[in-house]
């Protein structure tokens, strides 16, 4: 089954809704049995140092628009990008998502086996409101 952005498909008790990516593919919101999981795929605020400011601003606007589509929905588990390659901006998308959605538990992904991003995220003052809702690196079984 192929789903493009902004489509909804039911598979028995499973409901799959897609969101546009800011890179490749789509993001998924999957609901079943009263639980909801969000998998961001490559949906992230992909801002890069050295890129033209207008490109980074357009990226941020696209990302925020997609996250806005989740407004008012409870997300039990969200798998979100936390990419160390973005250097100082590594948590920008993650932070925005957590501050603008009703997410119970967030699981960083796309961190290229660089588990140091977990501690870096926890050290950011902006993460204080949701810090306790982010999975710890010890919850990942394929560590180092």
Task: Identify the role of each PLM range.
Residues 25, 88-89:
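Residues that form or flank phosphate/diphosphate-binding pockets in enzymes
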Residues 22, 44, 81-85, 110-112:
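Catalytic metal-binding/acid-base residues of hydrolase active sites
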Residues 76-79, 104:
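Conserved acidic residues
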Residues 2-8, 69, 90-144:
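Binuclear metal-ion centers of metallo-dependent hydrolases, dominated by the metallo-beta-lactamase
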Residues 38-39, 80, 108:
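Structural beta-sheet core signal
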Residues 48, 87, 116:
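Conserved protein kinase catalytic core
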Residues 2-74, 139-144:
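Core dinuclear metal-dependent hydrolase active-site scaffold
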């Amino acid at each position: 089954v192929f789903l493009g952005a902004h489509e909804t498909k039911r598979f028995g008790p499973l409901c799959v809704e897609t969101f546009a990516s800011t890179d490749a593919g789509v993001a998924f919101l999957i609901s079943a049995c009263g639980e909801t999981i969000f998998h961001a795929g490559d949906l992230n605020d992909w801002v890069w140092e050295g890129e033209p400011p207008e490109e980074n601003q357009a990226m941020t606007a696209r990302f925020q628009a997609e996250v806005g589509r989740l407004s008012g929905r409870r997300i039990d588990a969200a798998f979100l990008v936390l990419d160390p390659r973005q250097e100082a901006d590594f948590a920008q998308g993650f932070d925005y998502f957590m501050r603008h959605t009703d997410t119970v538990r967030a699981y960083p992904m796309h961190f290229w086996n660089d588990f140091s991003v977990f501690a870096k995220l926890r050290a950011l003052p902006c993460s204080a409101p949701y810090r306790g809702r982010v999975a710890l690196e010890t919850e990942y079984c394929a560590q180092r």
